[in-house]
Amino acid sequence: MTSATPNAPRLLVVRNDKLGDFMLAWPALATLKAASPQPHVSVLVPGYTAAMANACPWIDEVIIDPGDSASRKAQCQLLGMIRERHFDALLTLFSTRRIGWLGWRAGIRLRLAPATKWAQVFYNQRITQRRSHSAKPEYRYNQELAEAMIGRLGLKPATVAPPYWPEAAAGRPEQRQRLAAQLPLSTDRLWCFLHPGSGGSAVNLSLDAYAHLVEGVDRHMLEIGQPSPHWIITAGPGEEQHADSLVDTLVNQGSSAFRQPPQPGLEGFARSLAAADAFIAGSTGPLHVAGCLNLLTIGFYPARRSATPLRWQTCNSEDRRLAFHPPQGAGETDMTTIDLETAAASIAERLSMVETSSQSDCSGEAS
């Protein structure tokens, strides 16, 4: 968290859904904090993402949203908290009726949101985006709303760039040292983190498909004269058994695979990802954490318009992204139609451009 300029505008930003959605709001939050005079930025988030909000360098205050199903008493307490802070503006990155009604009742003078659905009636500044067309990345839609807010407040904008979690990205050497003390990893080989879980919402490859992919990457790396990577398998809550099963399969097929050691909570897990040379997953929250760390991300996406690789693109640098999805004409969510052999070859080619820690300086920065 950070501190704002005295007498600066007080903003309330709302993105109160899943981890991945919240991580894709960090570029917008960075855009707001880069403006001058620098505003005070509070966020309204669910308890699940509060730890990450507290770790975000672009946030001054975190307010917990009790959610749609909370009691009337809890909703009234939230309204009181919002009122007593005397916010100058409300920026809702994803508009809902409850949040629009909350901002209106709290008496926030400037209320800005996407012009979508009937919840927009509670906002006096509406930005037409047509997100359902998925013509841009989600994080760019969020940044456009932040840029509009900066303009409405008469602030001076500034350019921002990855990494959007610079402090955690700078902790890469420490995270690598910690992991090397826990697992028998060589710095002569790349450390590829693989997250096979779905978080309950994202479409992802099956465990068998990931095993096939890893075998292909290992084989292609050896064919081009590079050592195969170490594979560190991560897991979210309730996904541990699947992760263990994948590790067993990979070890049995001859890959160098390990389960990531337990981490202290969501923030600890998120920070630990900085140790990776590459992060592979479906379009899940951890993939977007890796994007904020400006890691090399390798994502597997469905082909439906609301969930394309473009729409849910990670917010790292353009040259640090690879994405795969079902071919045209296949089922939108049929991940079995992705050509894993072609994907493995592309991944191996990109990994061959990354320097191992033993080849680079002590920062371990991936190329």
Stretches found by the model and what they are:
Residues M1-S367:
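Catalytic machinery of carbohydrate-active enzymes
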